[in-house]
Amino acid sequence: MVNSAVRSLAIVGGVHGNERTGVEVVRRWQQKDFARYFPALKCHYFLANPRAIAANRRYINQDLNRCFRPQDRKNPYLMGYEQLRARQLAHQISLAGIDFIVDLHTTTAAMGTTLILNCPHPLLLNLAAYLSAQDEEIRVLQYSPQKDLPYIRGLCELGLTIELGPVPQGVYDPTAIAKTQRTLARILAYLQASTSGNVPAADNCTVYQQIDTIDYPRDEQGQIVAEIAPHIRDYQAIKPGTPLFYHRRGNVTPYQGAATVYPVFIGEAAYVEKGIAMALTQRKTIAI
């Protein structure tokens, strides 16, 4: 059985101001006090980037979800709006004694419902395995290990992101809101039950571990010169030699890796400026 010491949660929306789903979910849960259904848990709500939310923009000066490394928060010369917000949020989360963070996001990529985990902590893996069994659409993603995560969910060890897509930027999507609320409620129900050891432990969890990112082919001026091949789909296997990009002049760029990989965040609109057309993962089954 899984026994959790989680008592205090942060539910975060609006880290990216044009991802309206998380903003709406936080507002609804706070206004309607949905947390009363989970009395063993203390829920704290955060709308992370108020100016960007008001402007319906991803960010004001820079991506807030790249501002949470400890060394950046301690740097007195970093004074952009999001850098200041990162310090404020880190302070508030620390004062509240938060021991679990759920960060709500959407993506323009057709990824369905994805859980992005901080680390392979047994509680996170058991939770992810439980949720995957509840909803076959759910996939579990882990980024490459980093000592100091730049994401808000990295402010405590037990953190995860709910990432839902495809959802266009800046829109109110009732279906995405409903799916996010359902997944969030299941997370809280699991954590509530685990405080008294009332959930079974899983044997393993299937995880997609990020190993690389790929940019679009570009010319000498940095302009994109090719399109992602239409048969490339999120979480669908890419084998060596598979065409990845079709160029406007008719040539093809194939996948040149040596092993089968599984792409995610395919064509994510916000990642063009980061030089990312897609991320590549390996699918693994991790024993818990």
Curated annotation (Swiss-Prot):
Transmembrane segments: none annotated. One of its GO terms (cellular component) is cytosol. GO terms for molecular function: aspartoacylase activity; hydrolase activity, acting on carbon-nitrogen (but not peptide) bonds, in linear amides; hydrolase activity, acting on ester bonds; zinc ion binding. Signal peptide: none annotated. Zn(2+) binds at H16, E19, H105. It comes from the Bacteria. It catalyses: an N-acyl-L-aspartate + H2O = a carboxylate + L-aspartate. The keyword Metal-binding applies. The keyword Metal-binding applies. Keywords: Hydrolase, Metal-binding, Zinc. Disulfide bonds: none annotated. Substrate binds at R58, N65, R66, E163, Y271. Its EC number is 3.5.1.15. Its cofactor is Zn(2+). Binds 1 zinc ion per subunit. Belongs to the AspA/AstE family. Aspartoacylase subfamily. This is Probable aspartoacylase. It comes from Synechocystis sp. (strain ATCC 27184 / PCC 6803 / Kazusa).
